[in-house]
Amino acid sequence: MTTRTREWLRSFLRLGARAEQDGIPAVDIERQEDTVLRAMDMLDDRPGILLADEVGMGKTYEALGIAAVTRYLRPRSRIVIVTPGPDLNSKWYAEFSRFREMFDFGDNVAPARHLSEFLEKVRNHPVVVAPVTMFQSGRGSGAQSYLLSLYFHWKQLHGHTANAIMARFRDGDQERVDVRTAMFLGAFTLADVEPHLARAFRQGRSSGAAGLDDLYEKGGLSAFENMRAVHNALYRARFVLTGRLMPMIDLLIVDEAHKLKNPGSLRTRAMQEVFSRRFRKTLFLTATPFQLDVTELREIFSLFARAKGAPDDLAQQVEGFLANIDEYKRTYEEFQRTWSSLDPIVAVRFREAYDRDPAAAKQLDDPGIAVIFRHIESLRELKNSSIEPGFRQWMIRSLREDKRTYRRHLPRDIRAAGVEFLPFLIYERFIAELFRRKRQTHKAAVEINMVSSYAAANQGTILAEDDGIPIEAEAYRVLLRQILGEMESGPQEHPKLRDALSDALDAADRGEKTLIFCSRIATLEQLRRKLDSIWECRILERWRKVYPDAQADEIFDTREEDETRQRGRQSLLQARFRKSQDVLYLALREFHCRTVVTAADWACERLEEIIRRANILLQTLRVGKTSAEGIDYQVAKRCVEHAASVLWLEEHPETQPSETLQNLCNPDYLRFGLDLDEDDYEHDSAGDEQPRWEISERVARIVLGDRGSLWESMAGLLEKLPPDLRVRLVEQLARYLTYKQVSFLADLLSEALAAGLSVEPVESAALLEFMPKFWKTPCGQSWMNQLRAFLEYFVERDATQQTEILDGPIKRGDFARHTRDGESRERLREAFNTPLYPMILIANEVMQEGLDLHKHCRRIVHHDLVWNPAQIEQRIGRIDRLGSLTNRLRKNDATVTLDVLYPIIRGTIDERLFRVVKSREKWLEFLLGAPPNFTDYNFTEDPPISLPDRLGSELAIHLGPKKRAK
């Protein structure tokens, strides 16, 4: 047998192929390689493993690496990847294309969306990617009637008995189906399914829901009046038949496996029934193997037990392991209580002594030290004999060793004082009265509404609905509605909302993006509205640096009562940058003689000939009326650039022109531009009139462009794009810079004013001449750096992602977005991953998992806290990933942090939420590899002294791919 080493792995799998483009350090590539190798070794002698790396460490690529090794070793093997839903299914399928540089799966990968499609694909393709949501189909009456009729056929129930069952099912609304002609999932005949009907309709020795025959034999006809039991039996039959019709799977990969923790959920039952004994090996991916309690692992192991050839005593092994974990947790809690009760002076002495020499620490003269050492020995024994070996038998988990250094957790203490706190007090009294009158309500949920926003509280059930409110509580509700209404319409702001707005806007002013997680829809929408409104006020302040006394209606457009548009300074100046009859049109466009052929200086020496040729070309064109009557700088630019490029090639015949240069020399360039295609960027330059103006020397020099223009320094990046995409990108960015919500125009005028230019009025020619100087100012450099960073990100995306970016929020210049905007997750992701707008993304639960939002964001706000620490970690994992902005910045500045903000309104449920989620996080962290930490998970006024570093390292459970050196 071949020895599996890194060298062997690299002979066919190059996990580091994209390391440089994606900013992945070599050490992480090696860790991923080690993970793949260890996973393959583990799968040799066990049915399944958990790949549980912390969020953002590349589990997807590790899983693809394991799939690649499986296909390499067994070219005929079948692999199924089950994803959490349609969006992530598309993402996984797309990852195979990106993975091609590392290992080429060829055309063997197929996506599936529905169960029937999955069965067809899995029978005909070696690798299939399918969402677990495909199992949620089959609720329709047609599918259920077919399965009941199939049962009648198998059971040989005819006439009155079958009709009596149908009469009891769904109120007798459905009719029997002729199973001789009908097909299972629209594809499988009676002959296909008949061999598997006994397994489908009888539970036998398997666990789970009872079969239809079990119900009938036990309860007769009346059993079919229990709709829940019948539905479960029908689902069971559907899942069993699906599994029996599916070929054997060699490797089953399950993404976000923690979603299967609930044994009663439909997706968990489906996975158990469909894949029972239909796979040989399985790989479960999750950064949070358990969320609220370690016993959630039991469900994962129960799925491992469904593998073909799984050991019969697997369940007993698991129960023994969980019992050991319980003992370990009790010992740990005792140790924490003892340590916390130590005199701080003694604790400091112990810590210092233990870090030098544990034996010396044992000699300290204090009775508590002996107890401490007994706990340490007990923990060490349990860890080494059962806990670490038990986890390592089934799990690989790599940690971000420096995560606890660069992550900065910042609880923000928000105090609601005076009238601000009145709604909270009345709300509490209202809820208390409901409880006193035995009106059922979920107290925590309604309290969370109130700490989220007044809008969320108003839209909550107990305020929005009138039914069932006791008369004694109604007075509080009426008062609360009145107060909340006055506060929402007045100047008084919700304290947490005010904090969130101020924090995110201040960050945006510094050029930093913010990801806000908010689970209340009303709050999400209110945040978006207010962010846009306040940001407009901040943009106005930038304009006032140029026009100090200007009011909003002088700067921005307004609408009169008759809907007549009154244009402001911003809109008027924006039009000049976009209208090709104004010389400012050239300010943000690409000068091709400086970016494509770099021949502008050469052309200036031959200007007379170029002007002669350009004017001849000009007269061959037919343009619109406006462009015919006066200079159109887009038309003039194309004529001069085409003439100069053709002449340059004539004098340099040895040159092998690029596609872009060829397009520049193509006669169609005159009419359609660099993409040689008629589009929306031609403005008024298309028509049937002959130009009645000529290109002068002054105009020719202007359209050739001055040295130091915007795109000149980015020519190398632009050259990586095809001409059509290049044109679209430059035009869209030129428009983006002039949007109302973007401060570029105000910043430009501010710098122009400082340089002595007139801004009353703004002179186009003077401002255009100033542009190269502007790009050299600190302000201009900042804008240019943003655009360069955008380009660097953009050119590394695939064609689909590039389209998502250009069609996304950047197209409208949206400052803030939320996940209720109807935008696809991918489009929002791509836009947020650029340094341009949106600067703030307000996300709900949809964005918590599976999306990478880390390229240009290192700030996250948990506006609405949750009870589950795994959800908190998944949220943070959106921006804490390999190749993140934080990682890149820390290469040059080790003080850079990833900031995690927890806004907490004092005296409200926020405080309890924070304590509970942090207490639960302790076990998620400690049992899965982090050193024990008593300080971060302490909520007393006097936190205990931190443990010795040496002891923390000794007690940390190591689950990485390589064994830790003794």
Regions found by a protein language model. Give the residues of each.
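Helicase motor interdomain insertion/brace
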Residues: 1-42, 47-51, 57-836, 844-852, ...
